[in-house]
């Protein structure tokens, strides 16, 4: 179906089209010229009238023209980004289209050859029934899922994760808000956020206790105490003289004893006291995540499963320590497997980090940022893919975001976020980024190696419940009122 004709001057990258049919941004079109077919993407729609243009300054004249009703001539124009030749190779057009070139909607067959040849389905092209299937192998080059709040990030993560598990993929979600832990995702494997201190580094333990490196004396005391505790305990392990349940019960006393031993020569008693306070405060708040009986975290990750770690009850520092600990263990274990084969994590893992602007902030040096950066640089070689999720892209470390070769970007309105995403992306153009604010909820731009061409997609709706779904306030108020009244009736019964 012809929707319009090329007008004015054009380039091999872009053409202006005078429309005779209504279309919207995100539709794919085909231009046939120079004995070739070229695929284009509508990136902008404008409308106007030659009678009522920008040069008109007389309000009374506008009112008189308005009274003419349907007689006012109106035009619609589209800006079309020329993507590639439909020649099998998807090569760039050699020549621009000439004025008068007909423009039609691309057929499902033309679009399917480009967008439906991947491994797993993620949704459909906007304005068509053409499946969009992404290339799973390309996820080792990492993925960013970015959007404004409420635009469909969680739905996208749920759909992507569940589809990956169906092809025996292993996904690990660090569930910041508890959205997936009690969801209806198939192949769910919930993992308790337990940490065995014997597997921690002194830096990770210090972060858990909120002792920063710039608190030099406190940091030194804790490092020495924890290192001494680890060495002594691991020596006992070799000799079989360790009872793990006793370690759980006595950890507080054992580590405080070590603090006392290593700080005897410290002149500032207040630093020692502060370390003791930090340890006691941490163990009072988070004793449930410290468990000497907990096995290696890597052993809990299952293949063909959506593995979920619920972090919703923890604060940012505890989350940082846990996430960084898991990232370190996963990368190290995959390296061991690649080098020695028979040990380490035996299958690739895709790791999902939510609230990336917090854990991978450009303004703070978190432990998670260090290990996520390592995975962004090295993970591809060892089968560890990173998927970062955020509603504040401008807050993410640019070195990490720029290494997310693939991006799924849902509705985004904030100009500074769009500008930052454009600056940190090699495969995004300004016209596509500008169109992000026009997307509806659940619609996304997909770019990178996971698709052959930029795809404007309606992401599939996750068929199930997510704990993070918006509450129905009216229904919850009504239910609470009924329960209160029912309880009052019981209390008043027999009076």
UniProtKB/Swiss-Prot annotation:
Outcome reported for the amino acid change (mutating residue 175 to A): Strong decrease in ATPase and helicase activities
Major enzyme class: isomerase
Pfam families: DUF87, HAS-barrel, HerA_C
Described function: Involved in DNA double-strand break (DSB) repair. Probably acts with NurA to stimulate resection of the 5' strand and produce the long 3' single-strand that is required for RadA loading. Has DNA-dependent ATPase activity and bidirectional DNA helicase activity. Loads on either a 3' or a 5' DNA tail for subsequent DNA unwinding. Can also unwind blunt-ended dsDNA, Holliday junction and splayed-arm DNA.
Oligomeric and partner information: Forms a hexamer or a heptamer. Interacts with Mre11.
Binding site for ATP: 141, 150-155, 458-459
Catalytic activity: Couples ATP hydrolysis with the unwinding of duplex DNA at the replication fork by translocating in the 5'-3' direction. This creates two antiparallel DNA single strands (ssDNA). The leading ssDNA polymer is the template for DNA polymerase III holoenzyme which synthesizes a continuous strand; ATP + H2O = ADP + phosphate + H(+); Couples ATP hydrolysis with the unwinding of duplex DNA by translocating in the 3'-5' direction
Induction: Part of the nurA-rad50-mre11-herA operon, these genes are cotranscribed.
Xref: SUPFAM superfamilies: P-loop containing nucleoside triphosphate hydrolases
Keyword vocabulary terms for this entry: ATP-binding, DNA damage, DNA repair, DNA-binding, Helicase, Hydrolase, Isomerase, Nucleotide-binding
Keyword DNA-binding attributed: yes
Outcome following mutation: residue 380 to A: Strong decrease in ATPase and helicase activities
GO BP annotation list: DNA repair
PANTHER family: HELICASE MJ1565-RELATED (PTHR42957:SF1)
E.C. code: 5.6.2.3, 5.6.2.4
InterPro entries xrefs: DSB_Repair_Helicase, HerA-like, HerA_barrel_dom, HerA_C, HerA_central, P-loop_NTPase
UniProt-recorded name of the protein: DNA double-strand break repair helicase HerA
Listed GO MF terms: ATP binding; ATP hydrolysis activity; helicase activity
Family as reported in the entry's similarity comment: Belongs to the HerA family.
Domain of life according to the entry: Archaea
Activity regulation field: ATPase activity is slightly stimulated by either circular single- or double-stranded (ds)DNA with a weak preference for dsDNA. Helicase activity is stimulated by Mre11.
């Amino acid at each position: 179906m012809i929707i319009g004709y090329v007008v004015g001057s054009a380039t091999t990258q872009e053409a202006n089209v005078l429309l005779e049919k209504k279309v919207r941004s995100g539709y794919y079109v085909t231009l046939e010229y120079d004995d070739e077919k070229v695929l284009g993407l509508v990136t902008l729609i404008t409308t106007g009238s030659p009678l009522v243009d920008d040069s008109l300054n007389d309000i009374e004249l506008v009112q008189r023209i308005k009274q003419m009703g349907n007689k006012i001539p109106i035009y619609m124009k589209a800006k079309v980004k020329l993507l590639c030749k439909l020649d099998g190779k998807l090569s760039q057009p050699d020549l621009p289209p000439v004025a008068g070139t007909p423009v039609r909607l691309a057929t499902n067959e033309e679009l399917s050859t480009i967008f439906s040849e991947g491994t797993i389905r993620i949704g459909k092209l906007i304005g068509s029934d053409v499946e969009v299937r992404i290339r799973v192998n390309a996820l080792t080059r990492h993925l960013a899922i970015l959007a404004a709040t409420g635009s469909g990030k969680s739905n996208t993560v749920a759909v992507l994760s569940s589809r990956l598990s169906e092809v025996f993929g292993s996904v690990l979600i660090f569930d910041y808000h508890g959205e997936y832990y009690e969801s209806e995702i198939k192949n769910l494997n919930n993992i308790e956020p337990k940490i065995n201190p014997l597997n921690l580094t002194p830096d990770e333990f210090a972060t858990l206790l909120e002792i920063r490196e710039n608190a030099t004396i406190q940091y030194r005391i804790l490092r020495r105490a924890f290192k001494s505790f680890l060495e002594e305990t691991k020596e006992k392990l070799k000799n079989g003289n360790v009872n793990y349940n006793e370690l759980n019960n006595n950890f507080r006393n054992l580590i405080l004893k070590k603090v006392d031993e290593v700080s005897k020569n410290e002149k500032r008693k207040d630093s020692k006291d502060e370390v003791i306070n930090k340890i006691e405060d941490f163990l009072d708040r988070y004793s449930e995540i410290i468990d000497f009986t907990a096995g290696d975290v890597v052993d809990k990750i299952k293949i063909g499963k959506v593995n979920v770690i619920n972090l919703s009850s923890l604060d940012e520092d505890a989350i940082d320590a846990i996430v960084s600990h898991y990232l370190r263990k996963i990368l190290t274990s995959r390296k061991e497997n690649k080098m020695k084969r028979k040990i380490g994590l035996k299958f690739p893992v895709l790791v999902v980090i939510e609230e990336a602007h917090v854990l991978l902030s450009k303004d703070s040096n978190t432990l998670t940022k260090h290990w996520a950066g390592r995975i962004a640089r090295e993970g591809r070689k060892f089968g560890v893919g990173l998927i970062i999720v955020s509603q504040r892209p401008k807050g993410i470390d640019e070195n990490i975001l720029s290494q997310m070769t693939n991006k799924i970007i849902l509705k985004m309105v904030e100009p500074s976020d769009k500008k930052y995403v454009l600056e940190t992306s090699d495969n995004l153009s300004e016209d596509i980024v500008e169109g992000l604010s026009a997307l509806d909820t659940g619609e996304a731009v997909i770019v990178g190696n996971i698709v052959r061409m930029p795809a404007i997609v309606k992401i599939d709706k996750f068929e199930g419940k997510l704990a993070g779904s918006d509450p129905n306030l009216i229904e919850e108020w009504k239910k609470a009122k009924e329960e209160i009244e029912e309880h009052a009736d019981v209390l008043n019964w027999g009076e």
